[in-house]
Amino acid sequence: MDTKTRSTLTLINGLTLITGLALAAPALAADRDDRLRLVVPPWPGVTVKSEILAQLITPLGYTAEQQQLSSTVGYSTLQSGDSDAFLAGWLPAQQESYDAAMAAGAIVDLGNNVTGARMGFAVPSYVVEAGITSAEQLADPEIAERFDRTVYSIESGSTVTDMLDAAIESDTYGLGDWDGMASSTPGMLAEVKAAVAEEQWIVFYGWTPHWMVPEYDTRILDDPAGVYGPDNGRSDVKTIVAKPYAEANPNLARLLDQFELTAAQQSDFIREYSLEERDVEAVAREWLAAHPERLAAFLEGVETRDGKNAQAAVEASL
């Protein structure tokens, strides 16, 4: 079965489950569990998202337990029943772990909780304004010199740095004589900060959602060769729930299914939490208070554990 067919079937299965939950709306409050155990890798986006979700469900009568686990371990604990949900199912980056859990029938894919996620060759906006919009242009010798024939990336051995190394080895976009400069993520972003301060040309591995987008006005170049994946590096960021948990807790499953943000919204709160080093609870609380329309969408048809209006309960807590 090809990837597209598998993804389509996954979506259909997820929608079938949620449709069944929606039809069971009169019984939505009768969840089996009063606790939601969230897999939270040490990434700023999912850290804030998980806190937002925790602040949504606590006034409804549930307890949120945030488990500090890597994504790989998280897929294992979702299968073993030691975790309940995960808000950072990045695909195709986690495809192997995701496919194994799906094949075991252990998880339900509730779809994307972030729209507009993408990764690829990134540049500051002033480079785009100078006419550079596609990675294909890196093959131009004059343009290559402007970038000092260097692409900055994150940790050596990471999936995305391996993708860059493969592109250099295969001379994709004329990168055969370029250097791939792997570093820590903070190290790479320090190079970006220094270049932007002087309006120097720089190309680096970038992704959205991330605070680099608003901070450095980052743009991602077209990637027709698919160095960073198909469809110009567009990514899915899935809400993944342990299947037994979703079936036993239709009220929370509905909320999880409706929990969706834009990449720009997530980039903004990542910036506040990670770059400005603000308290995650304060960032989450202020975000909820400032986005009543999203709050209403998250909680449509959802009730408190004792059958009362969920939106009123959350608003009273903010």
Regions found by a protein language model. Give the residues of each.
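Short, well-ordered beta-strand elements
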Residues: 32-45, 62-67, 148-152, 256
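Short helix-initiation/N-cap motifs at beta->coil->alpha
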Residues: 41-44, 62-77, 179-191
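Short, polar/charged alpha-helical segment
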Residues: 44-63, 169
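Pocket-flanking alpha-helical
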Residues: 50, 70-105, 191, 211-217
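Ligand-binding pocket segment of bilobal, Venus flytrap-like solute-binding proteins
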Residues: 83-87, 156-225
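A conserved helix-loop-strand patch within extracytoplasmic ligand-binding domains
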Residues: 106-155
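C-terminal functional modules
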Residues: 114, 260-318
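A bilobed periplasmic-binding-protein/Venus flytrap-type ligand-binding module shared by bacterial periplasmic
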Residues: 119-129, 235-248, 271-272
